[in-house]
């Protein structure tokens, strides 16, 4: 053993048992269970564990009954005064009573973070868990689990900062109770939840000073979102473009709109309405549906110009999904309205431009490739990334556009999927060589 190792061992031996046990109690319980045979001195420290993370309990091919037995033993023999964290991921069928008992134990021992994932059962756990007495809980994440919160709780959930609900029935009364009781709430996630009633989600957080982040994802029966949150900084929406977003969000800095196309309703107007509150954001992630709605459009037989100017936008990422008529022209017209843009990412992993694009060739190509008037000069742009690059001729149009119109360009990365070689096009060597004479920093990677 080296001299340095000897010194470390001597230092450890000088520590009191109480101090070492306190330090070890903060380790995940599965780690202390696995290593308890290595030291007789600390073989029982798992009984004091504060971090009861059982998320990977099936990773060693245990059966459901074996996993439940291990968790039950931990709770029966737990001697610590507090439990900081409890993470559980299993099929709740047949063990609901045990789960309720475990959660009750956590609540009695001042739990701070509680994560319950019952998605493996494919059935929502209908037995409601009562959090009304919790005065310490700061993080609550429930998947496939019924959630109830009475209004005007005297104590419970006052310190809650993060709430994430998945596959839970949501009512506006519940949302009101959340914001009435959880006065320190910073982040709310609603994923694959069922919106009851009229399909209108109303979030009134006008008096909240700490509410910073909202995620609304995959709620198919949602018709409208009315959001009044002056302190909100990050808003993420994933769903049909038909859903109307009415937003009062003065502090918004980051927005994501992962739109899916609705077959029943033309979505341009609802997309435009949603963007009214987002033109001042610094970072924007979206799909080509946004471009279709806010770049040049024909309205009543007349060609309308873009509706928005994104004066503060610095980061822009767009996912292309078929079908779409969008081309480099639509991208360029959008970017022209972003004078401070520094980073641009386009993801075309699941998209391929058409072999022939006559409208582009006839109406837009000459306009975009004409650099004499500098209509598309991107002075601040430094980073460009194309994810899913396959060497298509129009992808090279996009690459050429950026090397010609971004004088401050530092990095241009083309990410080619390793498993998409069959979709890759024959390289246009001459054109690639021309592009590299303009900007030598083009980097092709495989991911």
Curated annotation (Swiss-Prot):
- Record-linked Pfam families: F-box, LRR_At1g61320_AtMIF1
Tell me where in this chain the F-box domain is found: 10-57
Which superkingdom is the protein from? Answer: Eukaryota
Q: Where is the FBD domain?
A: 384-416
What this protein is called in its record is Putative FBD-associated F-box protein At1g61330
Question: Which species is listed as the source?
Answer: Arabidopsis thaliana
